[in-house]
Amino acid sequence: MANKFPFWAAAISSQQQQPSDPPQQHSLQAPNSRSLLPSRSLTRPAGPTTLGHDLIAAFAEATATPYFIYRLRDAMLASPTGRRILRDRPRITSTSLNLPYLRSLPPGTVGHTYVAWLDREGVSPDTRSAVRYIDDAECAYVMQRYRECHDFYHALTGLPVVREGEVALKAFEFANTLLPMTGLSVFAAATLKRSERRRFGEIYLPWALRNGLRAAEVINMYWEEPLERDVVGS
């Protein structure tokens, strides 16, 4: 990841896929319609889990445009690896990554660490919402790539998918990507138990901000390539 500090190193010390097409479920939105998405996603009751996830995804897309997603796209264009990702447009799915093969890799490799985390947490890379409300096709792919890389960050930091782990990771992502939704998600720390809030403020938040700012742009990591390499050496 360039020559900068690997973002997961602090957490660890303390404790060729084929190109594919961009998301196909994209919905063109009139400017005034898109501007209503944030308020709709915040005020509409979240009912079933899938609906709640869809509303959060829509809010993330609405707040990322027009500036922030272009900034992230430009960061990829400024990086040789980022440009390769934009050219290849790989997708992270259970099929493209060949999860059974990753399970066969030695413990401590990037691929085994990733799939072991998926299995432990009971999650799948196939559950990420498709980008629908970003009109620029390249920027829509950048947002999709950000979503699909999220579980790699979880796996390599060891942060679980409980609220405390999610909020900590969102704080890291905000410091690194500046996407507004990640920053707004940090306010969810107010809903944590008192002991969790204290731990978050004293340990997780400083770690997240320090390493998010210190690390190279994580969007430029071609995760499909170092799967067989040791985590510490990656």
UniProtKB/Swiss-Prot annotation:
Catalyzed chemical reaction(s): a 4-hydroxy-3-methoxy-5-(all-trans-polyprenyl)benzoate + H(+) = a 2-methoxy-6-(all-trans-polyprenyl)phenol + CO2
Primary location: mitochondrion
The EC code for this enzyme is 4.1.1.130
User: From which domain of life does this come?
Assistant: Eukaryota
* Record's protein name: Ubiquinone biosynthesis protein COQ4, mitochondrial
Q: Where is this region: Disordered?
A: 12-44
- What is this protein's function per UniProt? Lyase that catalyzes the C1-decarboxylation of 4-hydroxy-3-methoxy-5-(all-trans-polyprenyl)benzoic acid into 2-methoxy-6-(all-trans-polyprenyl)phenol during ubiquinone biosynthesis.
Annotated disulfide bonds? none
The record, for InterPro entries, names: Coq4, Coq4_euk
